[in-house]
């Protein structure tokens, strides 16, 4: 295929997201090759799948390419500690804590639950924090099942940009977050316990700053206001609950959430500002 045709193909949001994903898989796979060769082979398979999704013309590669960024995001998030180890990166919590004190005068993740020691508030905020997980998949999939391919492709690209930016920062300048450093005073309850159990099973140490939860939720909110405004209003509320709930529960520093929100705004705004070739 001529170079001009390839460039034209990658001007589409769908194919650009797949190219970005393939590039990330290539770099991170090389970093993991020496210590985790099987994982590196899985990355190579992911690159091949993304390439197939870009250049394949039948229904199967098109569908796989459409959904691939959504499917692999949780897996790549789980690899973050391995990348930190491969790079030998040190944690930067002391620096982030200085920013926290400069901005707030104290550590919100330590004091917010003591200011609002109400079990009902605690359960609401932890429920809001857990709403992040459906917020990853529901907005784009609603567009997909309705056949709104342009909105779907742009939404998935915004999500992919947010995730890749976060994963790179996590690997190079990891931050543990307050969950590993002190015990919060959030009131106990079933939703609180469920949240803690999910994080214990699936969170990645070093992936606190910027908050990928906040970056993705805010990016999804901005994209939803463009393509499905009623859902955008709901996601705006979810974004607030994710931001406050993460700090209230002692999972993130306040500046993690601010940085994540700004990142989400930037990537979603950039996607909406670009004039895309909707063929890809």
Language-model regions: role of each:
Residues 20-29, 46-52, 135-140, 164, ...:
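Hydrophobic, membrane-inserted alpha-helices
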Residues 49-60, 142-149, 224-228, 269-275:
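Structural signal for the C-terminal ends of transmembrane alpha-helices
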Residues 70-71, 157-163, 234-241:
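Central hydrophobic cores of alpha-helical transmembrane segments
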Residues 125-156:
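Hydrophobic, aromatic-enriched interface-forming segments
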Residues 5-11, 32-34, 192-280:
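Membrane-embedded catalytic cores of phosphoryl/pyrophosphoryl-handling enzymes
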Residues 75, 81-113, 145-231, 276:
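Membrane-interface loops
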Residues 45-55, 70-77, 163, 262-272:
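Alpha-helical transmembrane segments and their membrane-interface exit regions
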């Amino acid at each position: 295929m001529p170079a001009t045709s390839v460039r034209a193909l990658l001007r589409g949001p769908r194919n650009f997201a797949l190219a970005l994903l393939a590039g990330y898989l290539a770099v991170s796979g090389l970093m993991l090759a020496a210590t985790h060769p099987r994982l590196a082979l899985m990355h190579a398979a992911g690159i091949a799948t993304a390439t197939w999704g870009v250049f394949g013309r039948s229904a199967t590669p098109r569908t796989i390419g459409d959904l691939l960024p959504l499917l692999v995001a949780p897996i790549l998030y789980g690899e973050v500690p391995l990348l930190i180890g491969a790079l030998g990166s040190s944690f930067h919590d002391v620096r982030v804590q200085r920013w926290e004190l400069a901005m707030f005068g104290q550590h919100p993740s330590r004091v917010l639950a003591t200011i609002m020691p109400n079990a009902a508030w605690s359960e609401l905020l932890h429920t809001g924090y857990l709403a992040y997980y459906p917020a990853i998949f529901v907005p784009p999939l609603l567009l997909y099942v309705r056949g709104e391919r342009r909105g779907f492709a742009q939404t998935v690209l915004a999500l992919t940009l947010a995730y890749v930016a976060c994963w790179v920062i996590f690997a190079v300048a990891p931050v543990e977050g307050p969950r590993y450093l002190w015990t919060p005073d959030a009131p106990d309850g079933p939703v609180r316990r469920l949240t803690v159990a999910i994080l214990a099973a699936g969170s990645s140490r070093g992936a606190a700053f910027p908050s990928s939860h906040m970056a993705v939720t805010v990016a999804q909110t901005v994209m939803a206001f463009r393509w499905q405004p009623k859902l955008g209003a709901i996601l705006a509320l979810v974004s607030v609950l994710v931001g406050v709930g993460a700090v209230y529960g002692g999972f993130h520093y306040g500046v993690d959430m601010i940085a994540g929100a700004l990142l989400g705004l930037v990537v979603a705004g950039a996607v909406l500002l670009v004039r895309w070739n909707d063929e890809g």
